[in-house]
Amino acid sequence: MLTKTIQEEKKTPKDESIGSYWITTFGCQMNKADSERMAGTLEKMGYSRAIDELKADLVLYNTCTIRDSAQQKVYSFLGRQIKRKHSLPKLKLVVAGCLAQQEGESLLRRVPELDLIMGPQHVNNLENLLERVDSGNQVVATEETFISEDITNARRDSTICGWVNIIYGCNERCSYCVVPSVRGKEQSRYPKAIKSEIQTLAQNNYKEITLLGQNIDAYGRDLPVTTKEGRKENTLTDLLYFIHDVDGIRRIRFSTSHPKYFSKRLIKACYELDKVCEHFHIPFQSGNDEILRLMARGYTIDKYKKIIENIRSLMPNASITADAIVAFPGETEKQYQDTLRLISDVGFDQVMTAAYSPRPNTPAAIWNNQIAEEVKKERLKEINELVEATSRKRNQRYLNNTESVLIEGLNPKNSMQMMGRTRTNRLTFVEIPENIEFNYSFGDELNVKITEARSFSLSGQIYK
């Protein structure tokens, strides 16, 4: 018999829905977490979630601008809603996120049908902004502001795993990256507020949390408290120790890390704290020191390799994932080959790859040594083939092993399989036993014997 535990939906405080909403999210985990908070705000206001984007009374696009392709996708989606707006003037159109912050007033000139344009720093102010819209105003909220503490329960997409923002913005100035200009300066949340949110998640039967930040291991640099030794008291390492005792939470993850701040002390904490999962996402971006210098990344390949060595010395089976950019302006064939060599030498579990895309208001965008599009395509194809082969090889180490898998739901493509993730963040499909009574709840951790290993997922059977 299969039983399924689903968290009860919170009821809207309004007696009746004031309309339906639809949110489409583009981009990173930070955007997804922001969307969950905005959905919570809308439901607190009395909106209900629509079953169809083209029937919603309020449509919100939470946007990304890290690459041009993500930006163009937003304009394509907007085109469908603009046609609706002409026949349904009461339809509210909202563009939030990084594209909204980047374009600001110019986006309103390009798409005058928009009701609200709001940058990431204004996510927690959505209700007030919509009240201004209801008063007949078109609103552009992109001014830099202090991010108010979120007091609204997020409308979370998962009932098992929850995202928790701990630091907003980024103070780094990588020459290719638009994030600092669209998400603002670093603003760290105070540890007690973070722990309180995690405790609420635990009370609602969440089993795993992922701490989020654009530059997460820089957490606490802007907080005032220091130790007697002069060290910042509120670092990511300190936070991990502080939240580790929350009852009910079984797994803790964090992302995204910057190599410049990934310390031995942090690695030691991850080893000592048994709830912290053995999965580390540490972008390297390029395997060549000169390209890293031009990118203004602030570390060398030797330093990066030393970080991986330190992790694996304590946690030999840890999963290491990363980001890489190919065809950065001026990248020679030899420099590109250095990136391929690094992937082979380190043996990453997965690498998220992209060809360089010039972004507005970044130094690299105006350099005159841009790489031809054809070369970009060739390099991206080659690196993706290497990543797939490397990932497949790395995953073979799981074969015939028994892994702890946190069950998150059913496989949407096969109702006779559950799916979840190992502590090392490997997506795993688990066969539901036949001909025996088997009780489970989503959120259970099951021992699974791995029977098949592919490039980006595993399959297995319950092991008793």
From Swiss-Prot:
GO terms for molecular function: 4 iron, 4 sulfur cluster binding; metal ion binding; methylthiotransferase activity. Residues 156-393 form the Radical SAM core domain. The keyword Protein biosynthesis does not apply. Coiled coil: none annotated. Pfam families: Radical_SAM, TRAM, UPF0004. InterPro entries: Elp3/MiaA/NifB-like_rSAM, Methylthiotransferase, Methylthiotransferase_CS, Methylthiotransferase_N, Methylthiotransferase_N_sf, MiaB_methiolase, rSAM, rSAM_horseshoe. It is an enzyme of class 2 (transferase). Its EC number is 2.8.4.3. [4Fe-4S] cluster 1 binds at residues 28, 64, 98. Binds 2 [4Fe-4S] clusters. One cluster is coordinated with 3 cysteines and an exchangeable S-adenosyl-L-methionine. Its cofactor is [4Fe-4S] cluster. GO terms for cellular component: cytoplasm. CDD domains: Radical_SAM. Residues 396-464 form the TRAM domain. NCBIfam families: miaB-methiolase, MiaB/RimO family radical SAM methylthiotransferase. Belongs to the methylthiotransferase family. MiaB subfamily. Monomer. This is tRNA-2-methylthio-N(6)-dimethylallyladenosine synthase.
